[in-house]
Amino acid sequence: MRHLITTKDFNKIEIMELFKEASDFLDEKPRTFLEGKSITTIFFENSTRTLSSFESAARRLGARVLRLDVSRSSSSKGETLYDTAANLDAMSPNAIVVRHANSGVPLILAKHMHCPVVNGGDGKHAHPTQALLDLFTIYNHFQSDVEGKKICIVGDIKNSRVAASNIELLSRFNLDITLVAPPHFMPNTHLKKYYKLDENIIANSDIIMSLRTQTERHNKTVYASLKDYANDFCIQKSLVKDKKLILLHPGPVNRNIDISDEMMSDERTLVLKQVKNGVAIRMAVLKKLILENEG
């Protein structure tokens, strides 16, 4: 049984095949590949973008979607993860998409399921489809020429599952990664790292990936105000200037904290393209896992 728990679950050849399929899906036309199939989404953490993206992807492939309301589910009343998995499995879905605040939950569920499990984000651990859509966006922009491209990841890297998945995936595709964050947001790493964003770092970058501060994962107050953080790490036109690069963000964007209003409307900012690409990538992932499982 194949699952997508981390980006390591797909090899490079499979990822390139996903990109080819996703490129075809960018026309947004409905398909019937998963007609008669059922996909269950169960998000124990709030989500707008990822949940909507997966559900749009499923419906465009012709699948039915069952969204479980976690606030009313038995898990909120003390049901164990094993029992949750057993009950989900008894409904005989063709795939399950799960998000949870605790790292490792999708893997635990996958061990008890008879259908593919897709990780929609677990704690600080992983967000594989976000990393895949980010690389897909980079890959398309640079017309397949991504090896050696310099990417600067800025923000709350230590607490970000998006950063963790991107670092693994982008390293495998030989991008040159630099991390920029305050000391308390910087993970232990062998990668190049800086504790303040400046013009020289941006001048040396082909891609900037800005991340949201994960205040919900902080066990103490780090900044008296997010404006203090923004003074050092907000992506602003005065820093970027006319540099030829692209700017990414997984969303939601804290405007004038992560990225300035001016840069959000700049043509180099590809946030909305990431959203469009995300549906196509998730279509490719769901199709691959479900049809391979039944083949």
From Swiss-Prot:
SUPFAM superfamilies: Aspartate/ornithine carbamoyltransferase. The keyword Plastid does not apply. GO terms for molecular function: amino acid binding; aspartate carbamoyltransferase activity. L-aspartate binds at K77, R161, R212. Signal peptide: none annotated. Pfam families: OTCace, OTCace_N. Carbamoyl phosphate binds at R49, T50, R99, H127, Q130, G251, P252. Pathway: Pyrimidine metabolism; UMP biosynthesis via de novo pathway; (S)-dihydroorotate from bicarbonate: step 2/3. It is an enzyme of class 2 (transferase). InterPro entries: Asp/Orn_carbamoyltranf_P-bd, Asp/Orn_carbamoylTrfase, Asp/Orn_carbamoylTrfase_sf, Asp_carbamoyltransf, Asp_carbamoyltransf_Asp/Orn-bd. Gene3D superfamilies: Aspartate/ornithine carbamoyltransferase (3.40.50.1370). It comes from the Bacteria. One of its GO terms (cellular component) is cytosol. Keywords: Pyrimidine biosynthesis, Transferase. It catalyses: carbamoyl phosphate + L-aspartate = N-carbamoyl-L-aspartate + phosphate + H(+). Its EC number is 2.1.3.2. GO terms for biological process: 'de novo' pyrimidine nucleobase biosynthetic process; 'de novo' UMP biosynthetic process; amino acid metabolic process. Heterododecamer (2C3:3R2) of six catalytic PyrB chains organized as two trimers (C3), and six regulatory PyrI chains organized as three dimers (R2). Catalyzes the condensation of carbamoyl phosphate and aspartate to form carbamoyl aspartate and inorganic phosphate, the committed step in the de novo pyrimidine nucleotide biosynthesis pathway. Belongs to the aspartate/ornithine carbamoyltransferase superfamily. ATCase family. This is Aspartate carbamoyltransferase catalytic subunit.
